């Protein structure tokens, strides 16, 4: 009988504690406190691009003339994802040259990772710009490449011409130096 009482008393105590916890909880799930939202004017500007964009012209190479596009096909789709913390740029959807660029913050810094059709993933960091209509990104490393020799996108300048027109200038490096610049002029699909 003493053994039963000795084992029963802690078990009853445990049940009382468990009942108190359950009664206090009332089955309500509590969300963790919200993290303070860190924002960046550049990321907010990128969020304004959400939607479909049509290629107006392409210029491949500094000496080339811009090639006007008339097919009105969607070339880029911007989407705000991850509770507003990331902007996804989906380039050339449904084509063999399909690519994705993710714009996000790293602390206060605006970054991008470009998932290139070349199979590498350059990262770039936005620099301070005196021109509020431009976001200028510079190479900050990458994966699946040796930047001293492998071809990769190295810099990007996005110019916000107006609410419905942008220009993207992608700088390509090979063998550790600038090789080419491709310029896309885009308009928002209405």
Residue spans of the language-model regions?
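Short hydrophobic transmembrane-like helices used for membrane targeting/insertion
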Residues: 3, 21-22
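Bacterial N-terminal signal peptides that target proteins for export
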Residues: 1-11
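Hydrophobic small-molecule pocket/channel-lining residues, especially in calycin-type beta-barrels
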Residues: 24-190
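Bacterial N-terminal signal peptides
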Residues: 10-19
């Amino acid at each position: 009988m003493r053994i039963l009482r000795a084992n029963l008393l802690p078990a009853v105590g445990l049940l009382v504690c468990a009942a108190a916890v359950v009664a206090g909880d009332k089955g309500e799930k509590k969300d963790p406190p919200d993290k303070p939202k860190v924002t960046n004017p550049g990321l907010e500007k990128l969020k304004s691009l959400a939607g479909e964009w049509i290629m107006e012209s392409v210029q491949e190479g500094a000496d080339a003339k811009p090639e006007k596009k008339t097919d009105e096909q969607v070339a880029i789709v911007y989407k705000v994802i991850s509770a507003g913390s990331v902007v996804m740029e989906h380039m050339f959807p449904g084509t063999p040259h399909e690519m994705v660029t993710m714009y996000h913050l790293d602390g206060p810094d605006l970054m991008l990772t470009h998932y290139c059709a070349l199979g590498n993933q350059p990262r770039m960091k936005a620099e301070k710009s005196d021109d509020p209509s431009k976001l200028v990104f510079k190479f900050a490393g990458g994966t699946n490449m040796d930047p001293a020799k492998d071809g990769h996108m190295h810099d990007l300048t996005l110019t916000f011409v107006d609410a419905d027109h942008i220009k993207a200038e992608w700088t390509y490096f090979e063998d550790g130096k600038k090789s080419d610049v491709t310029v896309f002029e885009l308009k928002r699909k209405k």
